[in-house]
Structures are given as C-alpha cells and as structure tokens.
C-alpha cells in the first residue's frame, strides 16, 4: 500500500519515483519548523532534496510528505525511520534495482553457428593466423598445434593430442592461448575457430571432434551457448565456458570428455582452469569482442545525451515562481495574493512549452502552508485539473472578500501611523482606494478628490504642503496619485535645506506663477538671496515684518487704490526700517500668490532694492501718498511715512 501510494503521488506530482521518498506517520500537530529540522537532520547528508507536498491522510491518521532528491541514491544509505515529533517516522522508497551481470554490455544479434571467429569477434577478436586454427588448429598429422598451437611443443600430447597445460580439447583441438581467438578470446580454447576448429580430420576426434562446427566461436565469438565444446564435443549446457566464459573446473567437456570418444582429456575431461577459454577468457568482461568491448560502446552512446540533458536540468531555476503560503507569522510580511497571482499567470504563459504535469509540479513547488494544502487536496480529488484551475481555486479561497461597505469604510478610516511616513501612507491609501473603486464603493471620477480629502483629514503633512494642498482643493484641481507623490518628494527635498526654508526661498523645482512682472523678473534672483552679503539677514527680517503687516492690515476697500486683483496682491506697503534708510540697504518685498506648485512655505521672494525696477516703487509711493492727502485734520510730521527713499 505504501509503495502504491508513493508511485501514485509521484505520478500526479510529476516526480521521479526512483529518486523520491515517502515519509509516513507525521503527527497532525507537528509544526512546520519541527518537520523541516527533522528531515534536514536525516536526509541532508544524502544530497540535495526538496519537499514536494505534505498533507493529512485520513486512512493513516497522520500526515505524509513526499521528498524528491536531485540525484539517484544508494538504497543502503537511506534511513528507514526518521526520529521526529510523536515517535519515529517511517520512510518508504522503491527497492534497489538488481544488478544484472553484463548489464553494461550491448545486446548484439545472434550470429549463425559455424561462422568464422573473425566475424564473431570483430576487428579486435579476429582469429587471424593465431586465432583461426584452420591448418594450424587442426594439429597436423601429429595432433600438434603448429606454429600457434595451444601448447606448442609442450602442449602436443603425441598422437592422442592431449591438452597439456592449456587444456585443449581432443588431440589437436587444443588451441592454447592463441587457438581460442588470440588474445581477444573470441573462440575460447575448446573450439579453435570455424568449421575446422578443434581437430579437423587428424585430430583423432572424428566427425564429432573437440569443437565441431560450433565449438569455435559460439554465437558471439564466446564459446557457443555455454562456451567451448560445441554441440558434440562440448559438455552440454554447462560446458566449457559456464556463465563466466570459463571452462568450469571440471565441466568443460562434460563427464563424457570434451572430445567425444577419442577426445582424451583425462578422465575428468576438464580443460583445466584455463581450458576452453585461454588467457582472454572467452566471454570475460570484454564480452568476447576483444579490446573494443561493448562497455565502451555503451558509454560512448550515453555521453552525448548526458551532456545535452544536464544543462536543461540545471537551468530550470529561472522558471521558478515566487513562494506563496498565506501563512500569518509575526514579523514576516508576505506579498498580497493579488500580486502573486498576477505573477503566476505571467509565468504560466512562459511555460507554454511545458506539459500540464510540469506546470502543476512547478506550481506546487512554490506553494506552502494553507495554500499548498488547498491545491494538494484538489489534485488528490481530481488529477485532471489544470494549473489555471488551481489558481482559480486559490482565488476563491484567498482573494479579498470585503463587501462594498467594508471597503469604503476601510478607505475612509485609514489614518497615518505614528511612525509611518507621508509617502508610505499615500501608497497604502491608494491600495484601499483602488479596492473600493473595484467594489463600486467609490466613483472613479471622484477618486482624486477623495484622496486629497483623506490626506488633509487623516495625514500629517507639513504646514507648507498643507497650504498648497488646500489651495488646490479650493481651486478644484486635485492632483492625481503620481502628482501627489511627486509633490511630497519635492517638498521633502526642499525641506532638506533648512537654510533656504528659513530664509523664505521658494521651491527650486517649481516655477513662480505670478502676473506681476516685477515678481516674475525677480524670481531668478531668489537663488542669490542667501549670498547677498550682510543685507541678507536684514532682508529676511523685513520680509517677516511685511508678512505680519499684510496679514494684520484692514480690508483695502476705502480708496480707489485698494488692490482688487492679483496685481494688487503682488504689491505691499513698505515699512519703516529703523536700522537705516539707505537705498542700498532697503529691500522690496513681493508677495507671491499661491497659484500652483510654486507656493513655498513662507511665500516670499527676496529681491535686493537695487535690482527691483522703478515702476513698482512708484506705485507703492502713490499708495502711500493718498492717505496723506485725504487726511483733512492734517497729521504731524511724526505720523507721515518716510518717503525719502523714493525721491
């Protein structure tokens, strides 16, 4: 049951079952960090791994987790239990694949018996002059092995053709070291090669001589079906080669002898430990194909595929989703579901080349906590769900479910926190505003007005910014979201220079909008106000006094010269400077009306007296002289304003 569960989970998760483990018995109350620590302590020495899924199983009464490793593992190193919360957790994995002998050898097609050893052994295992017995292996008249015979002078056993030390088969069938296919061992020693292998006519073995037709090479140049003795001279199924291509120790020729009636190989008929195989061991590890064995061929075939697939497996990281768990933890802020689901949809479009199984697998890898449990439960019930269906299900569970009235109340009651900056508050307020617009609680056409109203009501802007925003509100031209953020940034940059703000210098980035030509021409001089020498401090004090006088002055509706528009607002009454009356030290103060972003905190632009034009001074002089002419009682000399500076 556990193995079936492992295979099922790997199938719908798209995991490799050979590299995966199933952990059972995890208590339901086990915390996530406890699970991670226990798994890390037990499995991290084995290599890189990842937890694909973990959820509760009713039939087990506990949680189960699926873990996949990056590489194949040795089953003997995998722990069968993991110590954890509530007792040891059982580890389930597929059994080790049995190691089959010669599994690395390529499967060559069987060749018809009786073929020459040269064809069976290929280039490396050909008999040539030494391997193919032919005239040499026939043992001649004396049953010897000729030049390359199995035993040479010592191996020839007289007329009987004994096998000698090399254990040839029959009188002349012994091929010795060279008779069995040379050093490549293609034919073994029991049958020298080809049709004439082993004994020939003079081998004393007759027609059923030591190797016969099949005694030479067998199917693959080895030793026939079992090796060295062929059909008649061999030893049946368990003949000369056995499984290892050898001759066995005493069964190379069977109990009846490897050479039939005349094949005197001793009573045991054994070809010796080296019999029927020779030094090359007819089947050996090289598989009777000589030095160019099949192992090298297999490795050469696998290597290009490994080089091609390795980069593909390593470069999958760029397609991973950002993690999402919806787990509420103190001090851990996770991105909103709306932001994550948009990112997930974009990634699904990039994964268009991948199969649906891979898409679901990559989606599950990015999930955790409650989000992972939701999707895992859905896929367990219906494995045919697509990745988009999983995202839709997550949206139904985790998407904001606020009603129309709730979203409106959240927006209207949003206040600036004690340690929260104005910029961050406006950004947070915008999210609530957009959510209220989506729910239909706020008309989109009124969004800018409501945003500005909330900032003025529930935020803490500076005095200068508050005056600017109230002016925009009165003029019914509220800024947009980006415009408000830009205004806040400019105000923060302006406030970063206290010297300029204290001296009443207007904002550097904002142009001055005024209909007074003197103010418009004097605005470029504001940057040099702080560098005007000792008169700068006097000008600042005079500007402050002028501002107080302008605020406390009565309504100018008594005379014709009262300012009735922006032109009048651009002029102010000069004041008496007690510290001197020199024209070089007098300053002309100009009041700038707040018409836009140029409205500064102090609203004053300082201009040196000698830089100002004469028409504004003459206008001021006219305003000062009119009250003097209207006074019928006559004023004393001490009550008349000083006008010597204009003459």
Swiss-Prot record:
Pfam annotation, one family = PNMA
Chain intervals with Low complexity compositional bias: 517-570
Q: Which domain of life is it from?
A: Eukaryota
Question: Region Disordered: start and end of each range?
Answer: 111-199, 227-254, 508-580, 608-647
Which residue stretches does the UniProt record annotate as biased composition, category Acidic residues? 625-636
In this chain, composition skew of type Gly residues spans 122-149, 158-199, 227-251
Give the protein name, as stated in the record: Paraneoplastic antigen Ma6E
Q: Which gene encodes it?
A: PNMA6E
